[in-house]
Every structure is written in structure tokens, then in C-alpha cells.
Swiss-Prot record:
Family assignment from sequence similarity: Belongs to the Lambdavirus i-spanin family.
Topology in the lipid bilayer: Single-pass type II membrane protein
HAMAP family named in the record: I_SPANIN_LAMBDA (MF_04137)
Broad class of the protein's primary localization: host cell
Domain comment quoted from the record: The coiled coil region is probably involved in host membrane fusion leading to lysis.
Gene: Rz
Membrane side Periplasmic: residue ranges: 25-154
Residues that span the membrane, as ranges: 4-24
Function according to Swiss-Prot or TrEMBL: Component of the spanin complex that disrupts the host outer membrane and participates in cell lysis during virus exit. The spanin complex conducts the final step in host lysis by disrupting the outer membrane after holin and endolysin have permeabilized the inner membrane and degraded the host peptidoglycans. Host outer membrane disruption is due to local fusion between the inner and outer membrane performed by the spanin complex.
InterPro entries (alphabetical): I-spanin (IPR004929)
Protein name (Swiss-Prot/TrEMBL): Spanin, inner membrane subunit
Amino acid sequence: MNRVLCVVIIVLAVGYGALWLATNHYRDNALTYKAQRDKKARELEQANATITDMQVRQRDVAALDAKYSRELADARAENETLRADVAAGRKRLRINATCSGTVREATGTSGVDNATGPRLADTAERDYFILRERLITMQKQLEGTQKYINEQCR
């Protein structure tokens, strides 16, 4: 009976040891998988936060772009209206100019010709409006870029 009891105790000890090793192995695996899961959950939260931030920034940039595009279109329309008004004679393009010719004294009766005031040539007038439009475009682009840098590149 001693021998049987000794064999049973040894079998139980080996069984207990095997169960302990298996439990320890699966426990280590569970801890490893939990750590991996927690790491992936943090990465997912960070990715979601990044996506949300990017979406907010995209909406802000789209609103900024729409604002400055609208302002640029309004400025161009105003420039075209001014160009049409000058061409139709409703408005005059005033420049600070002086006549470079000298006044000649006539020996006969003095008089004044029916001369018009100084005026830009048609090509110079067209060039003026082209330069004005380009200046407006550059100003609006610069304002938009500065606003973008100040708001988005912080």
C-alpha cells in the first residue's frame, strides 16, 4: 500500500506540476495579448484623434479658402465694374499729370483751343486695370496665406 500511495502521490505531484506549467504558460500568453491589445487601443485612439483634428483643420481651411476666394471674386467684379464705368464714361480715371508742352505766345489774338485734359492712352488704361487686378489678386492671396499660417501652422 505504501508503494501505491507513493505512486499516487508522485502522479498527483507530476499532474499538479503539469497543470501549474500550463496555467503559467496561458497566463503569460494572456498578459502578452492584453499588453498588445492595450497598445493597439492607444494607437487607435491616437489615430482617431489625429483624424478628427485633420477633419477640423480641413473644414477650417475650406472656410478660409471660401472666404478669400469670395473676397477675390468680389474685388475682381468691382475692378470689372470700374473698368466698364470708365469705358462707358460714367466714371473717370483720374491721374496726377501735368502737360509737358510749353505754352507758346501767339502774335495774333490770344485764345484757348478746345483741348481736353490730360488722358491716358487706351493701352495705358488697359494696363492700369490689368495691374490693378493683379495687385488685388496678390493681396488676397497673401492675406489668405498669412491667415492660413497663423491659424493652421501653430
